[in-house]
From Swiss-Prot:
Transmembrane segments: none annotated. Heterodimer of a small subunit (PriS) and a large subunit (PriL). It comes from Haloquadratum walsbyi (strain DSM 16790 / HBSQ001). SUPFAM superfamilies: Prim-pol domain (SSF56747). One of its GO terms (cellular component) is primosome complex. The keyword Zinc does not apply. Catalytic subunit of DNA primase, an RNA polymerase that catalyzes the synthesis of short RNA molecules used as primers for DNA polymerase during DNA replication. The small subunit contains the primase catalytic core and has DNA synthesis activity on its own. Binding to the large subunit stabilizes and modulates the activity, increasing the rate of DNA synthesis while decreasing the length of the DNA fragments, and conferring RNA synthesis capability. The DNA polymerase activity may enable DNA primase to also catalyze primer extension after primer synthesis. May also play a role in DNA repair. Its cofactor is Mg(2+); Mn(2+). Keywords: DNA replication, DNA-directed RNA polymerase, Magnesium, Manganese, Metal-binding, Nucleotidyltransferase, Primosome, Transcription, Transferase. One of its GO terms (biological process) is DNA replication, synthesis of primer. This is DNA primase small subunit PriS. The gene is priS. It comes from the Archaea. Its EC number is 2.7.7.-. Belongs to the eukaryotic-type primase small subunit family.
Length: 385
């Protein structure tokens, strides 16, 4: 990035912060604050600052116009101290991070930025199902990171005291790491006999049970030949076992709906095992483990600008998420309504503000919000007006 471009972006970020009013997180004065300046080649964070040392946050942001702004998930007794021991850790929000670069099926070299963001929002919906249905967290905040993904802040009191190991268990559960169907089965006594029942009132057991019931309903709607062929497509199920399973489905489907994995012999258990592996692969949320397990993590400030895109770090109400499109709705109004001149250095197809177009190298006059986006992403430089 050329000096002229860097100076321009810092100036315009400062103009944005001159009018913006930031909402601070709970217990803001007990959190560590950090920022990355617009210095040439700088990726080093200035940290170990308390809100008291910064002064008024809005004034600090206007004066320094940082490239990136962060605050700690943790709450400390002395957040401005230079060592973690001196800070005296008290608690920390539980943070989930989804980054498009880490999503299955996304290649940062070939997948467009717009497509990465779309894929990431799909994964966000999956993550929120875990947060709401499996963990029943109440105090949550969803934030578009301004870059390639989303953050979810969980501030329920019972999670703030969790150490890194406990947070890793949450990550492992969501990502189905080392998850075994045996942990989802309980033994029940029924008229003197024992039955192995799939727990299906929530969590992973419910996900597997749903797939099992859907398969059973598909087999019920098929003729016998099709149903037997479908059953034999599962490893470990031959002709005889397929016939036994189909007979159970036709004569006693209620037992399977109740989660009885011993109905009809070992066949239903084999089906459940196979469907569990499918669920573990398809229904996880690819959260970034180091972010969640780090109890001292610094995370982006909602309402601030992301120096790598010029987009807003945007807090979202749940009802806003389905219709939220970052490349339209995370554009700062401050950068709309005027044109600037830039020099395109990296040509190619670009999606921005509801339009997709092919930009070519050379000097261009564009709306400022697009110009800032391209410059921040390293695809353009500022030229003299």
């Amino acid at each position: 990035m050329e000096d002229r471009t860097r100076t321009y972006l810092k100036g315009r970020f400062g103009d944005y912060y001159a009018r913006a009013r930031m909402d601070t997180p709970p217990a803001a004065n007990r959190r560590e604050w950090g920022h990355i300046p617009w210095s040439a080649g700088s990726t080093t964070m200035v940290r170990h600052q308390s809100l008291l040392e910064l002064g008024t946050l809005d004034d600090f942001l206007h004066r320094t116009a940082p490239k990136h702004v962060y605050f700690s998930a943790a709450r400390f007794n002395d957040p401005g101290a230079t060592t973690m021991d001196q800070k005296d850790w008290q608690s920390a929000d539980l943070i989930f991070d989804l980054d498009a670069d880490h999503l299955p099926g996304v290649n940062p070299d070939t997948t467009s930025y717009a497509d990465m963001l779309t894929a990431c929002k799909t994964e966000l919906q999956t993550l929120l199902e875990f947060i709401d249905d499996d963990f029943n967290f109440d105090e949550t905040q969803v934030v578009f990171s301004g870059g390639r993904g989303y953050h979810v802040h969980v501030r329920d009191e019972q999670v703030r005291s969790l150490d890194s190991a406990a947070r890793r268990e949450i990550v492992d559960y969501i990502r189905a790491i080392d998850l075994n169907i045996e942990t989802l089965i309980e033994t029940q006594s029924n008229h003197g006999t024992t039955q192995r029942i799939l727990k299906h009132r929530g969590g992973w057991g419910q996900r597997i049970h749903k797939r099992l019931v859907e398969l059973i309903e598909t087999l019920q709607a098929s003729d016998d030949t099709e149903a037997l062929e479908r059953l034999q497509s599962f490893e470990g199920i031959g002709t005889g076992r397929a016939e036994t399973i189909l007979g159970q489905i036709q004569n006693n489907p209620e037992a399977i709906h109740a989660g009885n994995l011993e109905a009809g012999g070992a066949g239903i258990r084999i089906l459940a095992d196979a469907l569990a592996q499918t669920a573990f692969e398809a229904e996880t949320a690819p959260i970034d483990e180091p972010v969640t397990t780090d109890t001292n993590r610094l995370i982006r400030l909602p309402g601030s600008l992301h120096g790598g895109s010029g987009l807003l770090v945007t807090p979202l109400d749940r009802e806003e998420i389905p219709s939220f499109h970052p490349l339209e709705h995370a554009i700062a109004d401050r950068f709309r309504g005027r044109d600037i001149q830039i020099r395109i250095t990296d040509s190619g197809v670009t999606t921005f503000d509801g339009e997709t177009f092919d930009i070519t190298e050379g000097n261009k006059t564009v709306e400022e919000c697009l110009g800032i986006f391209l410059m921040a992403r390293g695809r353009a430089e500022k030229v003299t007006e």
